[in-house]
Amino acid sequence: MNHTDTSPIKLRKNWNAREMQALFDERAGRTDPRIYTDEDLYQIELERVFGRSWLLLGHETQIKKPGDYTTNYMGEDPVLVVRQKDGSIAVFLNQCRHRGMRICRSDAGNAKAFTCSYHGWAYDTAGNLVNVPFEAESFPCLDKKEWSPLKARVATYKGLIFANWDHDAPDLDTYLGEAKFYMDHMLDRTEAGTEAIPGVQKWVIPCNWKLAAEQFCWDAYHAATTAHLSGILAGLPDGVELADLAPPTVGKQYRAPWGGHGSGFFIGEPDLLLAIMGPKITSYWTEGPASEKAAQRLGSVERGSKLTVEHMTVFPTCSFLLGANTVRTWHPRGPNEVEVWAFTVVDADAPDDIKEEFRRQTVRTFSAGGVFEQDDGENWVEIQHVLRGHKARSRPFNAEMSMGQTIDDDPVYPGRISNVYSDEAARGFYAQWLRMMTSSDWAALNATR
């Protein structure tokens, strides 16, 4: 049995910008495999990618009432996400300023304050230090305003909660850019918006976080192989044979001109959605009042009912799969491990039986034990296992597919558009990764636009 050692591969003490520039060659379509294994590159990622990007932290319906909270991560930093009395959301480092203990150790709940279990320092729901045991006797000069946890910027987009440590970063709306157009296919089908089905699934995969994030960014290509055959066979409704389903061929891929976001989608071919989610979800998505409402709201029948399956990554680690409606964050856990946090969203005004069907089918397909999820994870794990070898890390990976075949003036879809089977969005993903890794701050990043 293959065993993937998740200990980091230590190759060098540091990287300079010139050396990092050689890790990805967009013009040639070449990626250096060391980006998936090197510990020092990973530490730079934590600072320059995860410390400066807008990161997904959940859905607003997961914290409905004042005091409702969830615990989450931004990179490897634990954070608290808390609904405030005025309806706003606060995000702050889940770390007591006294000795660094985690302030809150629960996954979710409702609280009026948070008290560190080590020495009892207490913080309000906005992250302000409000009480210190024996303050008068032992801390006569303590300025509590100076000893609150680090607070992040918070913004939402149509129900999704994002946060950013960098106060010089562009606002979320600017950061997303035309990616919002593609996010709306899942998030804005109805004026009621979306809601998260209760529960977050969490599991660990021994692979680099970029392998997972980039697949959701560009890779419809793997769906044309036999990798998911077992999952398709398991989900076929009665009376439908595998031979009856045509492989999808009509679709497009989106790459953000700048920013690293990417998406791929199929148009007018419901067979793939039928194979993944079954007839009930397929019917809800492609015909009847819900699809008509979506077509009207999104501006075209193509976007409302014929765009049946879409994969997307908002750089760096927010990914979702429209149709299955799984939303996830790829939390890095060193260069050789990622922790997946996934939940399911549905139209808030969908009938209860449709919501239940989304829950049931997503658990069956894209969850910790999902039949499709396991196939994807097996590929990523095996790649990481192979990269333990010195020779395996010494030759570049190919990212040439559909190079030079993109357009910037599609009449319907904004951004850089190519055929659905393309590496274009992957090239955009790694181009943004490289910009962030080699830029000292957001001023330098903005200069590369």
Curated annotation (Swiss-Prot):
Fe cation binds at residues 222, 228, 376. [2Fe-2S] cluster binds at residues 96, 98, 116, 119. Pathway: Aromatic compound metabolism. Binds 1 [2Fe-2S] cluster per subunit. Binds 1 Fe cation per subunit. It catalyses: chlorobenzene + NADH + O2 + H(+) = (1R,2R)-3-chlorocyclohexa-3,5-diene-1,2-diol + NAD(+). It comes from the Bacteria. Residues 54-163 form the Rieske domain. GO terms for molecular function: 2 iron, 2 sulfur cluster binding; dioxygenase activity; iron ion binding. Its cofactor is [2Fe-2S] cluster; Fe cation. One of its GO terms (biological process) is catabolic process. Keywords: 2Fe-2S, Aromatic hydrocarbons catabolism, Dioxygenase, Iron, Iron-sulfur, Metal-binding, NAD, Oxidoreductase. Its EC number is 1.14.12.26. Transmembrane segments: none annotated. Belongs to the bacterial ring-hydroxylating dioxygenase alpha subunit family. This dioxygenase system consists of four proteins: the two subunits of the oxygenase component (TecA1 and TecA2), a ferredoxin (TecA3) and a ferredoxin reductase (TecA4). This is Chlorobenzene dioxygenase subunit alpha.
